[in-house]
Amino acid sequence: MKQLAQRLFSLALVLALVLGISVQSAQALSLQSPLLAVAEAEIRNEADAQRIEAGGKLDLNNIGVRAFQQFPGMYPYLASKIVLGGPYDSVDDVLKLDLSDRQREVFEQYKENFTVTPPRDALNEGDDRINNGIYR
């Protein structure tokens, strides 16, 4: 009797492997639950939401130092001051920082490329704004 049970179990296991039937695939087949549809509709990506709100400009409250590389004269010193000096209520708040005359000129030159939205936890956790771990 014990051998019969072992053989039946082995046969069932082999059939399941051959036919590709598993617990995950069985669960994947039953995704017609209305609760899952509601949960999927509520999922949103904080980074994408911020990009849409910023309207193509760089958001001073949610970008890292490396984003300033595209503006000559801002990376790394002025960019670090700006990132560490936030959060800001307006782009002009950057001018309240302790900046040299040259740094003020450089910021004024590129000021139209920036905007300010509320800081988002998903984009400001840890030290990612200072060092995002991307190296050349």
From Swiss-Prot:
Domain of life assignment: Bacteria
Keywords from the named record: Electron transport, Membrane, Photosynthesis, Photosystem II, Signal, Thylakoid, Transport
GO biological process: photosynthesis; photosystem II stabilization
InterPro entries, alphabetized: PSII_PsbU
Signal peptide start and end residues: 1-28
Gene3D superfamilies: Photosystem II 12 kDa extrinsic protein
Membrane topology: Peripheral membrane protein
Pfam families linked to this entry: PsbU
Quaternary structure note: PSII is composed of 1 copy each of membrane proteins PsbA, PsbB, PsbC, PsbD, PsbE, PsbF, PsbH, PsbI, PsbJ, PsbK, PsbL, PsbM, PsbT, PsbX, PsbY, PsbZ, Psb30/Ycf12, peripheral proteins PsbO, CyanoQ (PsbQ), PsbU, PsbV and a large number of cofactors. It forms dimeric complexes.
The protein's name: Photosystem II extrinsic protein U
Taxonomic lineage from the root: Bacteria, Bacillati, Cyanobacteriota, Cyanophyceae, Synechococcales
